[in-house]
Amino acid sequence: MALNIEEIIASVKEATVLELNDLVKAIEEEFGVTAAAPVAVAGGAAAGGAAEEKTEFDLVLAGAGDQKIKVIKVVREITGLGLKEAKELVDNTPKPLKEGIAKEEAEELKAKLEEVGASVEVK
């Protein structure tokens, strides 16, 4: 090979933006690749966690209120649980009802539960 890595880097440093653009296109065509920027995989909520908008929410039943039977009926409707399981869930609050749902769905279900007297949190 006639050129070594240092010579290639020196040539790239001296090239104009248009020449570099042509080089990228030629490399893409020659080797069948694309020069797409790598996408970072979303990790845990580290330093940038506060800046990101939350997309998944948890619906937590905080209390049943005075109309426990109506709350149990709505909980059964939302979760698909049987009567016994829904009653246990309502009796042992705070308990999560649904996890990882969209904000719109969480707000809709919260309104439905608050309508029958339950206290609900969206986290």
Swiss-Prot record:
NCBIfam families: L12 (TIGR00855). Belongs to the bacterial ribosomal protein bL12 family. The keyword 4Fe-4S does not apply. One of its GO terms (biological process) is translation. Keywords: Ribonucleoprotein, Ribosomal protein. The lineage of its organism: Bacteria, Bacillati, Bacillota, Bacilli, Bacillales. GO terms for molecular function: mRNA binding; structural constituent of ribosome. InterPro entries: Ribosomal_bL12, Ribosomal_bL12_C, Ribosomal_bL12_C/ClpS-like, Ribosomal_bL12_oligo, Ribosomal_bL12_oligo_N_sf. Homodimer. Part of the ribosomal stalk of the 50S ribosomal subunit. Forms a multimeric L10(L12)X complex, where L10 forms an elongated spine to which 2 to 4 L12 dimers bind in a sequential fashion. Binds GTP-bound translation factors. Signal peptide: none annotated. Forms part of the ribosomal stalk which helps the ribosome interact with GTP-bound translation factors. Is thus essential for accurate translation. The keyword Transferase does not apply. One of its GO terms (cellular component) is cytosolic large ribosomal subunit. HAMAP family: Ribosomal_bL12. It holds the Pfam family Ribosomal_L12. This is Large ribosomal subunit protein bL12.
